[in-house]
From Swiss-Prot:
Gene3D superfamilies: Metalloproteases ('zincins'), catalytic domain. One of its GO terms (biological process) is rRNA processing. It is an enzyme of class 3 (hydrolase). Binds 1 zinc ion. Its cofactor is Zn(2+). Belongs to the endoribonuclease YbeY family. This is Endoribonuclease YbeY. Its main location: cytoplasm. GO terms for molecular function: metalloendopeptidase activity; RNA endonuclease activity; zinc ion binding. HAMAP family: Endoribonucl_YbeY. Signal peptide: none annotated. Single strand-specific metallo-endoribonuclease involved in late-stage 70S ribosome quality control and in maturation of the 3' terminus of the 16S rRNA. It comes from Lactiplantibacillus plantarum (strain ATCC BAA-793 / NCIMB 8826 / WCFS1) (Lactobacillus plantarum).
Length: 159
């Protein structure tokens, strides 16, 4: 996976947090059998920054834990027609994942597990959204959460 990591926090992300993100993105990409040159970005930020994004793009004026912006969706009106051979040679850019480190701390304390577990959960959750998984319908929720749990367990971040 070709991962771009951005740290917009005021305190600075710890090296082990950044490594956790790299490892989980790689593992999730392997689990989904994505090409090695698949691109994704993860941005760490605080509650104030993610609240502004949540308000601007979702109309919800409060901080959230994770927001994913998929580069591609299933809307055929947005499809760009290109030579299939050329498309196969280009890396796939999945999109962007934004995570509130404040929410990581808050939710880890509330759920009584480690911040690493919470950060890992949000990384994988956001990554699966970028790959078309959602949890709006019960069957879809079961599929997404089962895959999420498998990836986290395989990495050693069991609940």
């Amino acid at each position: 996976m070709d991962l771009e990591l951005y740290d917009q926090t005021t305190t600075g992300a710890q090296p082990e947090q950044l490594q956790l993100i790299r490892d989980l993105i790689d593992l999730a990409g392997q689990t989904l059998k994505l090409r090695d040159d698949t691109e994704v970005s993860v941005t760490l930020m605080n509650n104030d920054a993610i609240q502004k994004i949540n308000e601007q793009y979702r109309g919800v004026d409060r901080p959230t834990d994770v927001i994913s912006f998929a580069m591609h969706d299933d809307d055929e009106d947005d499809l760009i027609v290109m030579d299939p051979e050329m498309a196969a040679e280009m890396p796939l850019n999945l999109g962007d994942i934004m995570i509130s480190v404040d929410k990581v701390s808050e939710q880890a304390a509330f759920l009584n597990h480690s911040e690493a577990r919470e950060l890992g959960y949000l990384v994988v959750h956001g990554f699966l959204h970028l790959n078309g998984y959602d949890h709006l319908q019960p069957a879809d929720e079961t599929e997404m959460f089962t895959l999420q749990r498998q990836i986290l367990d395989a990495y050693g971040l069991e609940k």
